[in-house]
Amino acid sequence: MAKSTRPFYTAKEINELRSAAQFYKLDAPTEFWRRVASELKYVCNGAGPDRWSELKRRALTDALKMYEPAFAIHDVEYEYRLGTQRKSDRRLKKNMIKIWRKNFGFWRWFSRAGRIERLVVIPTVYAAVAIGGGQAWEDAANE
């Protein structure tokens, strides 16, 4: 959600996230593609809720860098309240799995890092947004 007058991303970075979303063939609402990058740079804020400091969100986003395009799509869905929170959160998980598959390839289940990403990281992120995202979803409704 656009609470800050200071953007988290530049317009160029938003376009790079869009390119990555195309590369990974992520599922995204029309708003993600239709809105101008200069607007979305205030909407997309990386991983974590708006109520967190930028420092915390940057740290988490850096730790989960591979999934950044999925987070940008999720931010757009929350900001414009597209569909339902549950549908948005499920799309985030599906998009993270697409990224995981592409990055770890055929050997994804044979690599320890691949298994950790799929069995720990992705479910943890999904649980966090499914449980804690309600407040952010409501905040978007009240703006």
Predicted stretch roles:
Residues 1-143:
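Extended terminal accessory/targeting regions
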